[in-house]
């Protein structure tokens, strides 16, 4: 992890605007973050999304996670009028692929690290033939059924674990993704990425599915499941609890995070990684989900990580990662920053922008 950046009292003060849904504000912009940022010369200000962006500020940096098209239009208008001022994190065009589960995981195939994605198929037609879809994708039960769109709604998180074919048919309301469920010992590795920092946190996950469950015709063919990965695993014990050395090596995690960051062209995201352990294949890692601008309060030390990141962006010392994966081509906000680019509208309009 990069060392914390100091902020002398004589340094200029910056204003960082944030446009987030209320539930995201409560999971990121906590008093501990606000206090530390202020102590380091960064003022955090909420953007009123009901008002024109041009009437607010001035901001030196904008961070956002909004799904409204009107918000995106405002960002594009602001970028056209004042390119690079304020600095926008992250580019709406780069975020888009994470809002569609058909494209979300495409970037993984371009990584140079030994990690992959479970087999999956996109169901885009409600009249699709389940047998044909499953055969074409060579999927094996159990499956996870996920809504195709990731739009922040409760419906986008409505997932089901499907044990056999007759559990698929009622779900073909389309569009959705059917992804093969991989037994992973009930352990999920949630990796939070903030710029070039990656922090891996072990979480509990769905338990393994025994073969006999797939053959139990008296049991439900599919069941809904809640996201239970937000609870830390208990400390290791004598009853088979997860041990500290179960966590992937830091170097491996950093390499995966770096590849995703470059491939996606994003700075702020997390990804869910699982590990299959078998005598046949040994240890195999899979990425099953990538989420833009997660609830960082669940990441240890997130206040310092975000504050350091804001200062790096504002001081022009943090280059935007080159997008290498499918769909390359970043919007104008996402390009390499040069020193002095992190300035506010106040300096631009007064002609006092620092070089």
Swiss-Prot record:
Residues 225-248 are annotated as: Disordered. GO terms for cellular component: cytoplasm. GO terms for biological process: inositol trisphosphate metabolic process. InterPro entries: Inositol_tetrakis-P_1-kinase, InsP(3)kin_ATP-grasp, ITPK1_N. GO terms for molecular function: ATP binding; inositol-1,3,4-trisphosphate 5-kinase activity; inositol-1,3,4-trisphosphate 6-kinase activity; inositol-3,4,5,6-tetrakisphosphate 1-kinase activity; magnesium ion binding. Kinase that can phosphorylate various inositol polyphosphate such as Ins(3,4,5,6)P4 or Ins(1,3,4)P3 and participates in phytic acid biosynthesis in developing seeds. Phytic acid is the primary storage form of phosphorus in cereal grains and other plant seeds. Belongs to the ITPK1 family. This is Inositol-tetrakisphosphate 1-kinase 4. It comes from Oryza sativa subsp. indica.
């Amino acid at each position: 992890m990069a060392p914390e950046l100091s902020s002398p009292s004589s340094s200029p003060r910056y204003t960082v605007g944030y446009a987030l849904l209320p539930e995201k504000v409560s999971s990121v912009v906590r008093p501990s973050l606000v206090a530390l940022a202020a102590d380091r010369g960064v003022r955090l200000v909420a953007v009123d999304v009901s008002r024109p962006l041009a009437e607010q500020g001035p901001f030196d940096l904008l961070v956002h996670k909004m799904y409204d098209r009107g918000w995106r239009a405002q960002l594009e208008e602001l970028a056209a009028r004042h390119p690079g001022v304020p600095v926008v994190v992250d580019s709406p065009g780069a975020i888009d692929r994470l809002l569609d589960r058909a494209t979300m995981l495409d970037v993984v195939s371009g990584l140079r690290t030994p990690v992959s994605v479970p087999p999956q198929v996109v169901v885009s037609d409600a009249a699709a033939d389940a047998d044909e879809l499953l055969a074409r994708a060579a999927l094996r039960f159990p499956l996870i059924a996920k809504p195709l769109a990731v739009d922040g709604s409760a419906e986008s998180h409505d997932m089901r674990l499907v044990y056999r074919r007759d559990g698929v048919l009622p779900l073909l309301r389309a569009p959705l993704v059917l992804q093969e469920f991989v037994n992973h010992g009930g352990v999920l590795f949630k990796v939070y990425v903030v710029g070039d920092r990656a922090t891996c946190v072990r979480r509990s996950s769905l338990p393994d599915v025994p073969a006999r469950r797939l053959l139990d015709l008296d049991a439900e063919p599919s069941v809904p499941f809640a996201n239970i990965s937000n609870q830390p695993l208990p400390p290791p014990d004598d009853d088979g609890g997860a041990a500290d050395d179960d966590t992937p090596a830091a170097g491996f995690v950093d390499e995966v995070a770096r590849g995703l960051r470059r491939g996606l062209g994003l700075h702020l995201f997390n990804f869910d990684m699982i590990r299959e352990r078998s005598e046949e294949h040994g240890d195999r890692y899979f990425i099953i989900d990538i989420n833009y601008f997660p609830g960082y309060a669940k990441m240890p030390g997130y206040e310092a990580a975000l504050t350091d990141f804001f200062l790096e962006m504002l001081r022009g010392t943090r280059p935007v990662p080159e997008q290498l994966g499918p769909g390359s081509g970043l919007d104008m906000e996402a390009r390499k920053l040069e020193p002095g680019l992190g300035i506010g509208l106040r300096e631009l309009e007064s002609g006092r922008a620092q070089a």
